[in-house]
A protein has these predicted regions:
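Short aromatic-glycine-(Arg/Gly/Cys) micro-motifs in beta-strand/loop hairpins
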Residues: 1-17
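A short, exposed loop/beta-hairpin motif centered on an aromatic-Gly-Thr core
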Residues: 15-27
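Short, mixed-charge low-complexity intrinsically disordered segments
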Residues: 18, 38-107
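A short, charged, amphipathic alpha-helix used as a generic interaction element across diverse proteins
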Residues: 24-43
Length: 107
């Protein structure tokens, strides 16, 4: 039975770090990776990310691994942009509310 080791790609310097976590089930392992990657998007709005992935024969060759990593990294960057946009939007709405409140106090 194949086991799946969790790896972490530090995007700041493209260093791959093997973790001590192993999974017996690929679906549990992939779900864990998705959740960890999603948490990175939500928590580190303006910081570099760690990207979680597995060692697995699920990928036939290095090109497939690179393609998959590239797709996932693009997904994370896209999610970051969406989150940043939402935060900027909330920030501008908050400033607008504060500005309206100050103007109301002046009247």
């Amino acid at each position: 039975m194949e086991k799946y080791q969790l790896y972490i790609l530090r995007l700041e310097d493209a260093k791959i770090i093997p973790s001590k976590m192993w999974f017996d089930d690929i679906y549990t392992a992939m779900e864990y990776c998705v959740l960890k990657n999603r948490a990175q998007v939500e928590l580190n709005v303006e910081q570099y990310y760690y990207f979680y992935f597995l060692n697995t024969s699920y990928f036939d060759n290095d090109d497939q691994i690179q393609d998959e990593l590239g797709d996932r990294i693009r997904f994370i960057i896209n999610e970051e942009e969406k989150l940043s946009y939402r935060l900027r939007s909330l920030r501008s709405k908050s400033l607008e509310v504060l500005d309206n409140k100050k103007q109301g106090e002046l009247i």
